[in-house]
């Protein structure tokens, strides 16, 4: 029967006349029967058998190969005319099923391989219907899987034009060339094509012919880059999202935007190619990406002058940086930011720094978020260009205080400093909370005394199950744990850098030279003479060569006499010289201090004895994290020009912009302050004493041209203390502000669960999401994306919802279920306790869903932070959700998860584009403007309007709460950094790493 079926199939194409519809239909029917019989035989052949047992018979397969039926089928299909695509579709199905079930057994038989190569070769440069394209891509994918498992079969699919036409030509990898046109396709077709191409890229690592073909003759790299640029040009030029706290594109936003989905698919594919491809292919693709996408496409987009276009371009850049993971791609992005030749001498990084000073709150927020993303790369070159090159010579620190830079002892006083610089009203609040907690656990007499202290503080916390205590994180240990995790991760990344950035004192260099620890006696002698010569040159127009020569002669005589002494006498003489030199240097330093000089001119001599290649064997550097500065680079720090300078040292545009934004802390938008404090805390994580000298060391004064960080903190404290005095009214305002921020925290923590419940209750519909306008102004076509389908129900402190209550384990009543089904629309049923409010604060009961949720993706966090109390945060797997104020390390995860609670229509002018620092026509965003009656916000937000105090006082109260929690976080970071420095001092110094000082 099987042989009859195969024979009848062969009779159909013996007729050379034109094929009718019935003939084609008959062949297709017989092909189905033939494939079924062949699959049954292949199934029996693939079964495991005992050694030495005879192979099972396969008459159908033998007949198929012996009679060359597949070759005849191909020749017959060429003559089918208008039915050619239908016949080709059936042939592709046949090959697909046989290849997938036979593994590689049939590919080694010429009667099977020859017609397969013919049909593949004839498919080049052809346009097929979608169903034929789908089958072709599936077949190519199956072939790539088979070749990946059997690399020795690769040569079967390499053939040149000479083999067909006899006129020569380069070798062609037919499978790869057929897949290239489908690399940017949408849907499953493009996904399977990209998977197959990745398998081919992986094969290039195993077979040199594949790597040579792809790198030399294939057009995959230009196709990928041009396609990526084309997909970027299709992205909306303006992102119009009705939310004041929007700052980045999340993963959920990508899935809601088809254009962005295609772009990200292409970008992720490029990232995967760089990861698995041959070295030649990888380098070629990186060059094309830099020259064909970053410079001509992304660069001009970032340099646009329109604010809305700048916001969208920077949002796309932030998404790109967060999405790529391969070091090669990150390296060219860093190179793109630092390039000075491609954009008329203007660096992209400098442009981004300038936008930190923008008066547009949205542009400022997204710029702060972008720099937070860039800092998370832990890239040495970026840190060097942003800050370290301005701090390396330590000119910002007076001479008399430079010895403190590398010491860890004064860190203890810095911890107390940050706690003491908090606003007085917050100290009063913390005292009241501590007293209330103590009296609540004590006698009834203590409870009576609580009302005499404050009738408001702590009153709004009972529905959360407990008072939070000294911090909104419920425990200072939570800050310590989070700071420890972040500092450890950052230090581990910075250990791969080429250089250790710290200030090297003179005494250390002299001691190492005297003791033979890296400098010869002649080097130290020359060093001291040069130092004295430079110092004396500051006071005379002509260099006092005679004095220096006398000193030089004296040094030479001492050196000659020391050669005639015994080793013990030489050692004693060296110690005496060292003491004399130290006294001279102390006198010079005191002279500079008494004269008001800020620094002393020191020219460092870097050690040349370290081996540059020794550390390469012990660890693997990630090239993009490591600076392009070579390890054996000699850094010459000439400080002579700074000897008489006072207050003229610049910390660089980046730190200057951050300090300037911090000075307007009380006038900034709340969300700008959250991003700003988070960025500064991120800087404090780095294990860089030079950076600590301006952030975590209040005992070290600075001589910069702007107020120091600690001076700004004192100014903010004085400003808040002056406008928010310690009184009962201020305590009440602060209490409302704390409750507002706690309510915001629990909305973030329970966002995912509330989003699901919201979709169930609202039927998947919600308020309008962000609108993406393609083009400038209002002339472009608009693309509306319903990102608000995951909008969570807003929970207020006045509601009966208990965040610590477990899920209800009671069984649902069938009667109530049927009653709810058949209830009339106008009837009132049982209310859900989770959606009802008690009216204890707002005086009314309402259901208040949040207005937008375009950011609700929780990224994985490696911090491994845990909760020290139930009221801290919830942790699921490796995802972290921050504290309610999102201070420090946890702030980043919470901002990633943050939903948008405000809409522009319900806000006055200035919320979305408020000025920072008081300039401009539009005022800064205030909390009062965030809670307009009837806008659907929580009762707590409404109480901000109807509460006591002026609008300015309510805004200052929120600033005071944020500042207080941030200072506690900085205190915890300082404490943990001191422990890290102590541990590093006790461990052995790693060899072969140069010290940049």
Curated annotation (Swiss-Prot):
Residues 558-579, 759-922 are annotated as: Disordered. SUPFAM superfamilies: ARM repeat. InterPro entries: ARM-type_fold, FHIP, FHIP_C, FHIP_KELAA_motif. Residues 763-780, 911-922 have a biased composition (Gly residues). It comes from the Eukaryota. Residues 569-579, 781-792, 830-889 have a biased composition (Low complexity). PANTHER family: FHIP FAMILY PROTEIN CG3558, RAI16 PROTEIN-RELATED. Belongs to the FHIP family. This is FHIP family protein CPIJ015043. The lineage of its organism: Eukaryota, Metazoa, Ecdysozoa, Arthropoda, Hexapoda.
